[in-house]
Amino acid sequence: MIAIIDYGVGNLFSLKSSLAHLGQEAVVTADPAVIRAADRLILPGVGAFGDAMAKLTATGLVPVIQEEAQKKPLLGICLGMQLLFEKSYEYGEHAGLGFIKGEVCPLGPDLADKSLKVPQMGWNALHIVKDDPLFRYIREGEYVYYVHSYYGKNCAESTLAVSDYSIPVTGAVRAGRVYGTQFHPEKSGD
């Protein structure tokens, strides 16, 4: 069973529906016992980094996630991926879950082409930089769906894939059993 971690933000039910379409049993939960009993974890998210970390902390889920990710696969999606990093500079400086070495920074100031819109919203080609089982069903250059204004930076050792948005934008990361995708896999494929 997959536990979709519910901390009050995110695309929880569209994600659960996508997993059901793939024949995967999933439950949306904030219950630590259910999270501990799950085989795999997904940390979704839409919104601001600081608010999301505050909600995870207030619900007592930070230590549960950190402990369980040592034993089973964890996938962070969009903001969920960003939360995997050491810190973020979204509306101040905030500590993250610390699985991925690096930081989450605003996309706009780093863009080489200042005419590009932020947030990056829409389809972009994914370029695989490290082979990984995560890409078993994703081909090099396949288009994936993004909606974000911040991105993972200074994380080369964990970066699995990037997309070009006048700069290489981190598309997927991995550290041990912990994976993250900045793009939305539940909106990107069949």
PLM regions and their residue ranges:
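N-terminal beta1-alpha1 ligand-phosphate binding loop
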Residues: 2-24, 183-187
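Short gly/ser/thr-rich secondary-structure transition/capping motifs
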Residues: 21-28, 56-59, 125-129, 162-164
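Amide-donor transfer/coupling interface in amidating biosynthetic enzymes
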Residues: 70, 103-190
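Short acidic low-complexity segments
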Residues: 26-37
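Cysteine-nucleophile active-site neighborhood
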Residues: 47-122
